[in-house]
Amino acid sequence: PKALPFLFLSEMWERFGYYLMIGIFTLYLKDTERGFGLNEAQASDLYGTFIALVFLTPFIGGLLADRVLGYRKSIIIGGILMGLGYILMSIKDLNFLYLSMTLIIMGNGFFKPNISTLLGNVYNEESYKARKDAGYNIFYMGINIGAFVCNFFGAALYNMYGWYAAFWAAGVGMFIGVLVFVIGTKHYKHADQIKPVSETDMPLLKILGTILLPAVIFGLIPLTFETPLVGSKSTDAFLFGCIPVVFFYIHLYRKSPASEKPQIGAMLSIFAVVIAFWAIFKQNGSTMNTW
């Protein structure tokens, strides 16, 4: 389909910007001359908090795209937020650092889950269904190309001009991705569908009230402790924040019909493996950089 090249390039440029930033983030934080001069523990803690939130927001961004904004609008909003975040990260100021991290976290939530969903909707057309796997293979090639090439740009720009040039390159790359996406919008306009809420769907406010709000409240509890229980207060906050989410899935499993329990159990097992995989994989921005 004509949509594929545009979505391929949009995702390639988005991953170019994201992994360029990830590759230099902790190095930037620890640089005593041109960065923030944080020690290893502080930099790793901030990086870990950032990555955890990056993985949290797609849940919210996907919900909003499904039921409120639509996929195209969400992708454009996400791309713009991330591009601004990368550029603002070039400013050596703690306030701008936290602002840029917030923009990237929010932008990722809007962009990441929705561009792959939009591609899937394009391939749901009867004439393309048989080629869906091939389409996703090509799409993921774009991810790998962007994630690979960005490292050479990041290293070269830092050596020639400094950190700011590398972050600007990430931002410009992201904006190129947004531009490509907008240019190709006519090819996937028909696939941008806001899903009607069915009787079996949990209302958006109920999701926020029964999962996200309790997670936030539980996450705030460790901030009142004098000393961290596990490593740091941010680690404690995320562990406590996971408690309501785990209980929700246990409740979901127990409440489900007997015929659905094996499928839900298999899904939860996959979740556990995926969590372990990404926890190891994301060492590429902290431990692997240190080595």
Spans of features found by a protein language model:
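Intracellular loop-helix junctions on the cytosolic face of multi-pass helical membrane proteins
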Residues: 1-2, 125-126, 155-291
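Short amphipathic helix-loop junctions that connect adjacent transmembrane helices
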Residues: 21-44, 284-291
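A gly/Pro-rich, aromatic-decorated transmembrane alpha-helix motif that marks the paired
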Residues: 22-23, 59-60, 144-160
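Interfacial helix-cap and linker-helix signal at transmembrane-aqueous boundaries
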Residues: 29-30, 64-66, 153-162
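Central cavity-lining transmembrane alpha-helices of secondary-active solute carriers
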Residues: 45-66, 112, 148-150
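Primarily marks hydrophobic transmembrane alpha-helices of the MFS/SLC 12-helix fold
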Residues: 74-75, 136
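C-terminal ends and interior cores of transmembrane alpha-helices
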Residues: 77-98
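Intracellular juxtamembrane helix-capping segments at the cytosolic ends
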Residues: 110-126
